[in-house]
Design a protein with these regions (language model features):
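Short, contiguous alpha-helical
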Residues: 2-11, 29, 33-43, 50-90, ...
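Active-site rim elements
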Residues: 22-29, 97-101, 145-149
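Helix-adjacent hinge/juxtasegments
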Residues: 78-119
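Acidic catalytic patch
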Residues: 117-134
Length: 183
């Protein structure tokens, strides 16, 4: 007897994938909320008047680094809501650090709303995304979300160094910092 694979939306395999997608959506939403709370603490630890600090002439300013968080979350919301464009149309960097923080809050809310309203099956759909230097491929939405969150974590670490270099107090991130001991 020949074995066939069903691609019907009522097949057990499809139902299992849909259940897994729902679990992935919840896991991502939980981690996203925790990481964004921490990122906002790092952003607001930058001392007043230091948004144009850059540690090296080839480095971005603190304002430019902090604006990367909103760009990534804009991509997350677009991927979730089927508004993905490649190449992306990035908005200009906000003119003030207060505007950067406001954009961070707005894009956090947009992603949280998209996570709450997007069918979990969307996570398994693909969109074009870079996979290496001058390399593109179709990448699952869930993988884009994790990539962008990890990119945000990377830039949060970068910004925490700027906070330290400008005399700010670095908040605890995954454990105590020199400025926020736990004991």
């Amino acid at each position: 007897m020949e074995q066939t694979t069903s691609t019907s939306t009522t097949s057990p395999a499809f139902a299992a994938a849909r259940t897994q997608s729902a679990a992935n959506m919840k896991q991502f939403a939980d981690v996203f909320k925790k990481e964004n709370s921490c990122t906002r603490r790092v952003m607001t630890a930058l001392p007043e008047g230091q948004s144009e600090f850059r540690p090296h002439p080839s480095s971005k300013t603190a304002r430019e680094v902090a604006s990367i968080f909103s760009l990534g979350k804009g991509g997350m919301a677009a991927a979730l809501t089927n508004n993905w464009q490649w190449p992306p149309q990035f908005p200009p960097t906000p003119a003030t650090y207060a505007d950067v923080v406001a954009a961070f809050d707005a894009t956090t809310q947009a992603v949280e709303q998209a996570l709450a309203n997007t069918p979990s099956a969307r996570l398994l759909e693909t969109v074009p995304f870079f996979t290496g230097p001058k390399q593109m491929a179709d990448v699952r939405v869930i993988d884009i979300l994790w990539f962008m969150l990890h990119d945000s974590i990377h830039h949060r670490g970068q910004l925490s160094v700027y906070v330290r270099m400008t005399g700010g107090k670095v908040p605890s991130i995954y454990g105590p910092s020199g400025d926020e001991p736990w004991v």
